[in-house]
């Protein structure tokens, strides 16, 4: 038996129908379409507005489309991993809820938490599981209902985020020179003061005080986060290129975390990679946290060709960051959205 490689064999995605555009936001807070577009590059974002629906709904819709597209037998799935910052509940895991709704009879499921870096980290975990030889098919889902954490009276953060989910099927293959090649993943651990949600965890449990003082919303010091994101992501991209002896001309695609268009532009410029090789969809989805990378992959799938050199990179709360080098395993044009 040859070396086992872990390859993505299909991509699914889902975004809610409701579109919250900049014009509507300008009626909610003191902002303008021009200000938002210039600062972060976002024109609109999707919001899950139906009551009683959470992240598991988004994840299930993306996974269901993935299963239908690939034609994979659900009974052959070994594991399902959901990476999210906005789980339905503290427990049980969102992944277990998704698994139950999909009717996966022979799989186990668990959640993974790495904020906006979640998909990058989880793809590496799934690849390692596949390469161990113990598992053959794993569904990885990045999903977030960021609207549940956003304070729509805070113009600094409410313009940034949207809801969505992306899913990939990761399978085992003995084909050479395809799939996840290697990763460079890092955690700073000093980022807590700059990006967090103050209440709701074991340090500061929910109470009348935390609700009254609006402590259950996302808190971010934007300028500091921007600076760290640009520095870390650009260094990570250059490191993964160095590890694999890649020049800028060798890179076909960069799939970045879609947090801010200016961050994406700065990162790729530092790495010497032209913007036309970068998948950018932040203008119409906003920052969907763990969902940004798989949603970008979903949008770009039809353009990807077998053998393409793809670099994933992301940055999130913690701070967590990294990059991975992936050789695409199929012609994406064969699949439609």
Question: Which residues make up each language-model segment?
Answer:
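Short glycine-rich phosphate-binding loop at a beta-alpha junction
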Residues: 75-83, 248-257
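Acidic-glycine-rich active-site phosphate/pyrophosphate-binding loop
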Residues: 29-38, 89-103, 139-146, 202-210, ...
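Short acidic, glycine/serine/threonine-rich loops at helix termini
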Residues: 20, 91-93, 150-154, 321-325
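Claisen-condensing/thiolase-fold acyl-transfer catalytic domains that form or cleave C-C bonds
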Residues: 56, 60-63, 67, 86-87, ...
């Amino acid at each position: 038996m040859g070396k086992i490689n872990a390859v993505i064999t299909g991509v699914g995605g889902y975004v809610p129908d409701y579109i919250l555009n900049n014009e509507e936001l300008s009626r909610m807070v003191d902002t303008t379409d021009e200000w938002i577009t210039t600062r972060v590059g976002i024109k609109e974002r999707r919001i899950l507005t139906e009551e009683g629906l959470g992240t598991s709904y988004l994840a299930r819709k993306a996974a269901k489309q993935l299963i239908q597209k690939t034609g994979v037998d659900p009974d052959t799935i070994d594991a399902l991993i959901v990476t999210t910052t906005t789980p339905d509940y503290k427990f049980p895991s969102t992944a277990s809820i998704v698994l139950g709704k999909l009717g996966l009879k022979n799989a186990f499921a668990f959640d993974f938490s790495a904020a906006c870096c979640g998909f990058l980290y989880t793809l590496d975990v799934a690849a390692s599981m596949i390469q161990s030889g113990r598992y053959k098919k794993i569904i990885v889902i990045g999903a977030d209902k960021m609207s549940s954490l956003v304070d729509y009276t805070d113009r600094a953060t409410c313009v940034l985020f949207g809801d969505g989910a992306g899913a990939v099927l990761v399978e085992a293959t003995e084909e050479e020179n395809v799939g996840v090649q290697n990763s460079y993943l890092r955690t700073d651990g000093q980022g807590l003061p700059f990006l967090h949600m103050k209440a709701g965890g074991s340090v500061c449990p929910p109470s009348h005080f935390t609700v009254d003082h609006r402590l259950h919303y996302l808190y971010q010091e934007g300028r500091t986060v921007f600076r760290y994101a640009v520095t870390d992501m650009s260094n990570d991209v250059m490191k993964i290129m160095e590890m694999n002896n890649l020049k800028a001309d060798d890179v076909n695609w960069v799939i970045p975390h879609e947090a801010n268009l200016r961050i994406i532009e700065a990162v790729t410029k530092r790495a010497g990679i032209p913007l036309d090789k970068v998948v950018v969809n932040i203008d119409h989805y906003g920052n969907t946290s763990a969902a940004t990378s798989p949603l970008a992959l979903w949008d770009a799938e039809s353009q990807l060709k077998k053998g393409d050199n793809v670099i994933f990179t992301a940055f999130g709360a913690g701070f967590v960051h990294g990059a991975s080098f992936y050789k695409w395993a199929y012609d994406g044009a064969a699949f439609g959205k």
